[in-house]
């Protein structure tokens, strides 16, 4: 009997402690983030887990409404403090969706913006860098390939680089690729162009023979060069360079070069012949090409200075000029030159 009374007293004490704890829970309306851990420690679930086995004796007693509230989850709303944003930086958000709203399952932060899962690429970084490297490698490879193609000429690096710059203009910085005969023709034209700029004596027929192309292919290559390099025409149409080339080809003594040069300049700048139009090479030579003008001047000098003059048809073969065109041009210019030049020259 005494044991039963003692047990009932223990139960009553335990019951009062439960009521006291439930009142303390109801007195607080909200939890803060700083009290989250402490609220979890005194939550009803943890409290039920920590109750002694003698608590099962309550199952035989009727529970009041306050007792029933002990065994329910709290319905209070958790409010974040003002510095919640700084505390949420450490949160690894796990975003979940509920009724069209997105919020973090850990910290409770709500996300109102749309989430895009598409990959975005920044062209200023990897892709552009790879493309730039490819262009630089392509330029380097093209220079070495041209250097290999012109290896048989034995040119120095400076001249090779100038030829490469001219070739790069024709191919629009390497964007156009030319192969086979057209590539050889463009290279041959670029070599002739650079040689004319540097005043290096060079015969285009020798270049054509060295590059193993014909005149038609060379004309195509030179046409491509003229389209991209406008100053090519003035460099190509240099009569003095053509005179030097013919001197070397015809084995004429260099001491006569100044005499022939004087004939050419006198005829070019003459004022005795009047025309309504103006020409770069004067009123006598008009719009004839440089090689034909050089051949006309040299043949006129040979005809007036030597007794045994080579036939003009054979002379055209030596100069690699079509017979008909040279004969027609000389027949047209010779009477006009005779009005300006008189032999012997003083």
From Swiss-Prot:
Family of this protein: Belongs to the IIV-6 359L family.
Protein name as catalogued: Uncharacterized protein 359L
Originating species: Invertebrate iridescent virus 6 (IIV-6)
The organism's taxonomic lineage, starting at the top: Viruses, Varidnaviria, Bamfordvirae, Nucleocytoviricota, Megaviricetes
